[in-house]
Amino acid sequence: MAFAVIRACSRVGRGGLYKRLGGLPRGTRRQRQRRQGASLSTTEQRSLAPRPPTGPPARYPSPAVPARASEARRHPAADLDPPPGEPQAVASRGTPEPRPPPESPGAQPPPGPAAADGAMAAAKPGELMGISSSYQAVMPHFVCLADEFPQPVRPAKLPKGKGRLRRPRQSRFKTQPVTFDEIQEVEEEGVSPMEEEKAKKSFLQSLECLRRSTQSLSLQREPLGSCKLRNSLDSSDSDSAL
């Protein structure tokens, strides 16, 4: 025990476990770090401050510049909604159209009922398909495709009963069971003599196949029963020595 204490003291030394590192004390080190941080913050503020312009003064655009430049800088999605005075097809193409000169209010008569009916008929195919007018303006080719290739109308479902179309029995899997409705239909329709002969022949063939299979199985059992098996498959003999 004394030897272990002496060895530990020799490892630790005279100064103990916590030796002081050489250099400046802690207080001066912290002060120096604070001063460095303050100097860095002042330099960053100076670098971020705006500098006065030294070059030639910037040229401002003259008012005579057309408004197309500002329109081109707009987001492309802004062209989806056309202005109120511009037609939708022109707005979707993006080509400017010269607007008609403003006329006096009394020069053009108000639209009659025939014009209103024509406008409603033009807007009907799109509305019937569930396409809004803005969709027609953005994607007119889809509306044209729908006009060229109309969707087929689904036939109305017939009520269950004699009016229902019965699928042919030959196209069905043989393993699928026959329903009672089909049996009743056959009984009501009646069977021709040729079909009855075919049904009798198929029934006799199936009976003959069944008789042959049972006969072959009985013939196989006889030699198996006559000879004695050396290794029994019974679970009670599994522990016995062979």
Swiss-Prot record:
<protein>
    <recommendedName>
        <fullName>Uncharacterized protein C11orf96 homolog</fullName>
    </recommendedName>
</protein>
<feature type="compositionally biased region" description="Basic residues">
    <location>
        <begin position="157"/>
        <end position="172"/>
    </location>
</feature>
<feature type="modified residue" description="Phosphothreonine">
    <location>
        <position position="175"/>
    </location>
</feature>
<feature type="region of interest" description="Disordered">
    <location>
        <begin position="152"/>
        <end position="178"/>
    </location>
</feature>
<feature type="modified residue" description="Phosphoserine">
    <location>
        <position position="216"/>
    </location>
</feature>
<feature type="compositionally biased region" description="Low complexity">
    <location>
        <begin position="232"/>
        <end position="242"/>
    </location>
</feature>
<keyword id="KW-0597">Phosphoprotein</keyword>
<keyword id="KW-0963">Cytoplasm</keyword>
<feature type="modified residue" description="Phosphoserine">
    <location>
        <position position="232"/>
    </location>
</feature>
<feature type="modified residue" description="Phosphoserine">
    <location>
        <position position="206"/>
    </location>
</feature>
<feature type="compositionally biased region" description="Pro residues">
    <location>
        <begin position="50"/>
        <end position="64"/>
    </location>
</feature>
<feature type="modified residue" description="Phosphoserine">
    <location>
        <position position="238"/>
    </location>
</feature>
<feature type="region of interest" description="Disordered">
    <location>
        <begin position="215"/>
        <end position="242"/>
    </location>
</feature>
<feature type="compositionally biased region" description="Pro residues">
    <location>
        <begin position="97"/>
        <end position="113"/>
    </location>
</feature>
<dbReference type="InterPro" id="IPR031521">
    <property type="entry name" value="DUF4695"/>
</dbReference>
<dbReference type="Pfam" id="PF15766">
    <property type="entry name" value="DUF4695"/>
</dbReference>
<feature type="modified residue" description="Phosphoserine">
    <location>
        <position position="192"/>
    </location>
</feature>
<feature type="region of interest" description="Disordered">
    <location>
        <begin position="16"/>
        <end position="121"/>
    </location>
</feature>
